[in-house]
Amino acid sequence: MAYSSCLCEPGFGTELILRRIDGAIQVRSNTDPTFYSFVDLGGPGVPVVIHLGSSLLENPYIPYQCMDGYLSGTG
């Protein structure tokens, strides 16, 4: 079952849109339509990014670490 949610980081104007698909989370941004990645939640330990396609990943101001709480809460 897929579901979606948003994480908003104050001061950055960025939302990361998360959608769970078959044990992985698809991450997209509302500020850059080219940003997307898939995070595998299938096993124990640290979540692993299994696919990247982004210009935002090179931007140090994007709060990618704000996903930590969400990802640790889904496992």
Curated annotation (Swiss-Prot):
It is found in: Plastid, Chloroplast. Its main location: plastid. Pfam families: DUF2647 (PF10839). Keywords: Chloroplast, Plastid. The keyword Plastid applies. InterPro entries: Uncharacterised_Ycf68. One of its GO terms (cellular component) is chloroplast. Belongs to the ycf68 family. This is Uncharacterized protein ycf68. It comes from Pinus thunbergii (Japanese black pine).
